[in-house]
Amino acid sequence: MNKTVLITGCSSGYGLATARHFHAQGWSVIATMRTPRDGILPRSERLRVLPLDVTRPDSIAAALDASGPIDVLVNNAGIGLAGAFEATPMAQARRVFETNTFGVMAMTQAVLPRFRAQRSGVVVNVTSSVALAPMPLVAVYTASKMAIEGFTGSLAHELQAFNVRVKLVEPGYAPTTRFAQNTELRVDELIPEAYAPFAQPIFAAFAQPALVTTESDVAEAVWRAANDESAQLRFPAGADAVALARVA
């Protein structure tokens, strides 16, 4: 039977690769993004692009009304933020949480009545390898993702009785994604002069990482998580994330 997945944050990066991967596997795909873009996904009767802003309840309701029945929700939409916490405006910290944390919770809560009623469904929450090992200069981002790690673990137990599975995909560092671009503030604005000697070698190391994650690594991990019927909760994605998971 043909299955349907709804994926958030499909305009680029992990979400775009995941939408392409599920479509290539024969699934029906509902690819959502704040501002739909033409030409980035294949034209197909099994693929629809819908507008969705996960921070707006009315947008969530409209997208789910338009989507029809779904079998899997992939909460991928997120924004990055790198810099010294001391220099991070709290308004920006709240914006990160609105998307990365409360947006995931809101999407999940909106689909649960459907999944519970049909006694099937999978929620896949995409977090980050920062949840596997603390890293400097991403304190707010880490906090937003760690919250979803705890949320997902608890929810997985809560929904077992309804045959609804909840999974985590933990991507590593992907230099080709728009992590630091998905924010209103540039990194250099968040590095005060006093932090520069500390920050410079860290950013230099990120420029030449020994191990990295690719978009296809994440798409394949999401695919495995969505189809996994075991009790496995965490699916690290990418060589660096897998290495961290071994020692976490």
Regions found by a protein language model. Give the residues of each.
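SDR active-site lid
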Residues: 161-231
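Substrate-binding pocket helix/loop in short-chain dehydrogenase/reductase
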Residues: 84-85, 92-94
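The beta1-alpha1 cofactor-binding region of Rossmann-like NAD(H)/NADP(H)-dependent oxidoreductases
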Residues: 51-62, 90-91
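Residue(s) in the substrate-gating loop at a strand-loop-helix junction
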Residues: 128
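Active-site loop immediately N-terminal to the catalytic Tyr-X3-Lys motif
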Residues: 86, 133-140
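N-terminal Rossmann NAD(P)H-binding glycine-rich loop of SDR-like oxidoreductase domains
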Residues: 11, 19
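Active-site helix of classical SDR
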Residues: 108, 144
